[in-house]
Design a protein with these regions (language model features):
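Sec-dependent N-terminal signal peptides
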Residues: 1-10
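Intrinsically disordered, low-complexity polar regions and short flexible loop motifs
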Residues: 12-253
Length: 253
């Protein structure tokens, strides 16, 4: 299993329910051959206007909104977010043919100003019985561990970091817990149904102290690479599962 790090790659918001509640299946849309960005609003209680290169693309965007995708030429672009108490601009480089997510979210520190991170979606081919998942930590909490089907497979993922995994298609139970703790989950457990040959981008956001923890998710269809056997997790004795890396988002706000 490979967990790395950001919602409508192309489609809808997926709201998290109470512990044990199913959150799927996720519906996939086709990937585009052109360069594009999708913009995700992940700041609870905020309403923002969004502009790309000075052109307004949305007004009054609320938490959970997934805007786009917006087709862009390769090269440098700027995305700005404005609203009551919010004035954030983020510059990014868009690669040819890339699908890039731009996420407005809160930092780990309570009361911190919103930040923006962006990253390219991993849209490479995948085996017919596999699903690819990207889980990003964009919540107002300390570093967290990720449990999949009751097993801790990623540890110490900080705000602005992510994990990427390829898993067998089907339903998986996912929970976010305080790093190194056996306490109750910060989020979940959630039953997430993943269709074969899809990429699901899942963002954990909000603050468990005020009950605003939730997720935003979107999916896209992937092409097959002919491989049949799903990737499995080779867990290590500490830290991440062997062969897995957790990286910060590609670009900062």
């Amino acid at each position: 299993m490979v967990l790395a790090a950001s919602s409508a790659l192309l489609l809808p918001m997926l709201a998290a329910g109470p512990p044990g509640q199913a959150v799927g299946p996720l519906t996939a849309g086709p990937l585009k051959a052109v360069s594009s960005i999708s913009v995700i609003q992940a700041v609870p209680g905020a309403t923002v206007d969004v502009s790309v290169d000075g052109r307004s693309v949305a007004t009054g965007a609320e938490v959970g909104d997934i805007l786009g995708p917006f087709d862009l030429s390769p090269g440098g672009h700027e995305v700005t977010f404005t609203g009551p108490g919010i004035d954030v601009a983020s510059s990014l480089e868009v690669a040819t043919g890339a699908s890039t997510d731009v996420v407005l979210h809160l930092p780990a520190e309570v009361g911190g100003d919103p930040v923006v991170h962006s990253y390219d979606a991993p849209t490479g081919a995948i085996g017919p019985d596999k699903a690819r998942v990207v889980l990003a930590h964009t919540a107002t909490v300390a570093p967290a561990d990720v449990r999949v089907n009751g097993e801790t497979v990623f540890t110490n993922i900080a705000n602005g970091e992510f994990a990427e995994a390829e898993v067998p298609a089907g339903t998986h139970e996912v929970a976010l817990i305080p790093s190194g703790s056996t306490a109750d989950p910060i989020l979940g457990p959630l039953d997430v149904a993943l269709e074969a040959r899809t990429l699901s981008m899942i963002y954990a956001y909000g603050n468990p102290r005020d009950g605003s923890m939730n997720v935003i998710a979107h999916t896209a269809a992937l092409t097959a690479d002919g491989a049949v056997r799903p990737t499995t997790i080779d867990t290590g004795s500490a830290g991440l599962a062997r062969g897995i890396t957790v990286n910060p988002f590609l670009l900062g706000g």
